[in-house]
Amino acid sequence: MPPCSPSRATFFEGRYPFRTNVRNAIVTLDLANSQVSPYEITTPRLLRQKGYVSAVVGKMHLSGSDLNPDNNPLGDDVMRELGWDYFDGYLDGGPYPIDTSAGGVGDSGDYPCGFVPNTRDAANGADQGICHLPGGGESSMSIDDYDTPGQACLEQWGVFVPTGVAAAPDFDLQNGYYTGDWIINNMDGSDDRAPVADSRSRGYRTVLETDRALDWLAQVREQQPDHPWMLSVGYSAIHTPLQPPPRALLPSDAEQTGGYDCTDLSNIRQQRVMTKQMLEAMDHEIRRLLIQSGVARTAGDSLQYDPHSNTVVIIVGDNGTYAPSVRWPFDPTRSKGFPYQTGVWVPLIVAGPMVNQPDRDIGHLVNSTDLYSLFAEIAGIDLEQAVPAERDLDAQSLLPYLTEPVYSSSGSTGIRDVNYTEMGANLAAAPAPPCVIPSYNVCVQIFPQQEVCEDQGGSWYGPGSEVGGVPDSGFDSCCAVNAFLGEEAVDIMPTSQRAIRNAHFKLVQLERPQCEAGEPTGESVLSEEFYSVNEETPVPEIDRAAEDLLADTAPDGLPEDGLDPRANYAALKADITTLLASAAECPGDGNLDQRVDQQDLANWQRFSTSNNGMSSWYDFNHDGHTDEADKAIIDANFGNDCRL
């Protein structure tokens, strides 16, 4: 899927976003109705049927967080409530913004990468000082031992105070990849939390994510040696903000980044170097995870999977690359956040004892929902028996691709005929303020805070905007932004984007809001684009704007020769129409069983009396409150069986 939360939800639910309402990256304004429901049969619940214990470490981004408790009805227990036995991570979608005061040592903006640079930055740099640690310890650091003492201190969990500077380090400030707010749901049912000043939350996230994954594996192997297990590690990298990783994770000849400006998103070269180094660091840590867990071993300069570990390894990306990091032959203007190939075509790597003839490429269509099926197949679970038919699973089988090498042969037929992707607006009581992202030339209403908008390279047009001429109260819509910009108006992000493709062609449908006199009319207009696509190497045919086959003709004007674009358009249009029409509607049913009954009343009672009766999956009118108005919807539909 184009953004992170919908992809991650499909991994563990096996259902498309239009069935679950998880249509976009979950932010603080999004209601519980657009978060993974506790009534879903998630992967850990599914695998528990076969005795599996399960854990999530790092990022998952399936729910709200305490940044807005009103929209996070399950609180810090949410991952346990969704089925996992253990959670050690964070509920937010990515690292916090970089602390450009470097722990309160300078003014905001002095240190754009979150640490004091060396004196190559003549204005703000320092080559010696004291590294203060959160527990009260300290040590002297200088350029005699470190290229950039300030960065080395940050890597060691500290705050660097240059010699001659009178400043008290502030350990309560979040700082990009080097701090966090970790929530721990223990196997015994107890909970713990490591806030930003806690030494357990300090250090480079990719390293901490690996450490904690290994810690859980050691725990479960010791305490439950006879149980199969599933561990999901959600690495934060390389989500924005881009920030230099520890030097120890990089090749010895890696470029020095101590003088970089991490906040200068217009410096594409610096952005690319940091992207590459963060990927190198993640590669280093994945390697460490696999080796120290006993799943792989070194073989010269390579990594060799060990089939005797009896462990399946799956590595997958959750969405396409962020625009400044995109490389040819992909299209940075149609990357993360869009349903085009650059935004949804991601790596999927599988190793395991059942893989017949490893090192094969599979050229067939695979959807993120299909991982749900693969998890079940690995555990020996029949989804048709384990999941009620009314759940409308979209996952299709993946295991045959691993066990049957014939699928790698030229001319073989894949399991999927078509592949579907989508992104839209999550349900919210009020929309987010507008943010214009110049690299996409688009206005979006996704990000709830100015800092998040700016981390994505955007210009904030909400309250407190620093754009000249914008009122202090900001604008409340992208329509108002375009009225303000006049002839320099930008595109407005579609409220719904979806695409369906087969082996040769791709149909894209976009619904854009309509504006009148600087205000949204509440109406949207559907447009379609149609492309020829393939996975040829080294340069695949992808869906660039200039290649839209419908740009200059109506569908009935498409050619019928060659691969017959006209017939393919008609088939894909019929497929997507049928698919979207399969969405189930059952007013008053909050627990997804397609019935409105006493259980729904009991569940409504639970959520109307907990968390101050705010947002929940029983807030049927989507006003952010679980109240009598929602109970009235249950009462009006009581006894309905929507399966009939």
Language-model-derived ranges and their functions:
Residues 581-644:
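Cellulosome-associated attachment modules in secreted, modular CAZymes
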Residues 83-86, 91-98, 108-109, 321-327, ...:
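C-terminal cap/loop subdomain of S1 sulfatases and analogous C-terminal strand-loop tails that border
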Residues 23-24, 32-37, 49-52, 61-228, ...:
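Formylglycine-dependent
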Residues 213-273, 319-333, 533-536, 542, ...:
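Active-site His/acidic residue clusters
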Residues 1-3, 32-41, 199-207, 269-284, ...:
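A short beta-strand-to-alpha-helix junction
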Residues 1-15, 56-68, 90-94, 234-241, ...:
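Short, solvent-exposed turn/loop segments enriched in Gly/Ser/Thr/Pro and often Arg
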Residues 207-221, 255-311, 583-584, 588:
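A long, amphipathic alpha-helix that forms part
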Residues 69-82, 241-242, 292-358, 364-367:
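Histidine-centered active-site microenvironments of extracellular/periplasmic hydrolases
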